[in-house]
């Protein structure tokens, strides 16, 4: 994990092509144009998009933000964590998660939540291996607009 820490940085607009590819690998197809439009989030002080660089390009990213709700103290929440297929199992996911935790602590947050699709077993095993614990099971509903 330590070897990756020096390769993690804040995202830039020119990362859009790689972020689109990585998002698609995760199962959320996105075009470069769509990602460029979404990168307006880089201006949000309560959000951080961290990218890991490798010799062969962008190896992964993590999207973390402050979640503010009426019913509890603010907490950090991971919106997405993607490690490119060639880099899985090399400690990059743990390094990205540690960087997101550092970012959250620096903002005085005491919790970092990560939601993982119940159908994806691999991420569950990863999160438990790096010390995360399950705090709730839930369903996500979408209301048609």
Regions found by a protein language model. Give the residues of each.
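Short hydrophobic/aromatic beta-strand or adjacent loop that forms the aromatic wall/cage
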Residues: 47, 136-140
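Conserved GNAT acetyl-CoA-binding A-motif
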Residues: 104-116
């Amino acid at each position: 994990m330590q070897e990756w820490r020096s390769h993690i940085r804040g995202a830039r607009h020119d990362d859009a092509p790689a972020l689109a590819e990585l998002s698609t690998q995760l199962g959320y197809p996105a075009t470069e144009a769509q990602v460029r439009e979404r990168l307006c989030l880089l201006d949000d002080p309560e959000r951080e998009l961290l990218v890991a660089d490798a010799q062969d390009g962008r190896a992964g990213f993590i999207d973390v933000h402050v979640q503010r709700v009426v019913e509890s103290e603010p907490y950090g929440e991971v919106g997405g964590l993607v490690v490119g297929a060639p880099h899985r199992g090399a400690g990059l996911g743990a390094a990205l998660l540690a960087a997101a935790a550092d970012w959250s602590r620096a903002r005085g947050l005491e919790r970092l939540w990560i939601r993982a699709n119940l159908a994806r077993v691999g991420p569950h095993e990863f999160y438990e291996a790096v010390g995360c614990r399950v705090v709730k099971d839930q369903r996500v509903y979408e209301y048609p607009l």
